[in-house]
């Protein structure tokens, strides 16, 4: 499996730790779409880069990290076909995979500690989409464009 990872300047250390963690624990290839610099970096750039890599099939899933996880997830969710969830605890991360078939995870380097971030990543990576009623009731509705 290939995982795309992106970040802004706030989350360089988190990105590196999570990247190494995933490679060591799961043996997945993790492709960097973020910055390695502490110089100010505009988070939407890496959020959209990872999202585009997911929808284009360059990677299977994406993880994005900024200060709160919110801004970078909003940038990712602009890309058609992306379902990026911002999580600050493992339970929501796991259920986002099981019920909503999320294909991207976001979290904040200023919100969660690194050990909790690893737990969130574990819950999200091991969660499997259940389909069934979740597909009928949720994903079809979520995937339809809103008409005004």
Language-model-detected regions and their locations in the chain:
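Conserved small/polar residues in nucleotide/adenosyl-binding loops
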Residues: 140-146
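A short, Lys/Arg-enriched amphipathic alpha-helix followed by its capping loop at the start of a domain
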Residues: 17-28
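Short, glycine-/small-residue-rich phosphate/pyrophosphate-handling segment
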Residues: 90-134
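A short beta-strand-loop structural module common to alpha/beta enzyme folds
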Residues: 29-40
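N-terminal beta1-alpha1 ligand-phosphate binding loop
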Residues: 2-18
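Mid-chain, well-packed structural core segment of small domains
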Residues: 65, 70-106
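Short active-site oxyanion
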Residues: 2-3, 59-62, 81-83
């Amino acid at each position: 499996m290939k995982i795309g990872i992106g970040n802004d300047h706030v989350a360089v250390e988190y990105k590196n730790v999570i990247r190494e963690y995933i490679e060591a624990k799961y043996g997945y290839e993790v492709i960097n779409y973020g910055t390695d610099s502490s110089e100010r970096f505009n988070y939407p750039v890496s959020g959209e880069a990872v999202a585009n890599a997911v929808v284009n099939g360059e990677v299977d899933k994406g993880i994005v990290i900024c200060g709160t996880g919110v801004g970078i997830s909003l940038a990712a969710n602009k890309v058609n076909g992306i379902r990026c969830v911002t999580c600050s605890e493992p339970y929501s991360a796991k259920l986002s995979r099981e019920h909503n078939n999320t294909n991207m995870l976001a979290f904040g380097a200023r919100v969660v500690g690194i050990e909790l971030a690893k737990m969130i990543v574990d819950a999200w990576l091991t969660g499997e989409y259940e389909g069934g009623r979740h597909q009928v009731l949720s994903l079809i509705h979520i995937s339809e464009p809103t008409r005004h």
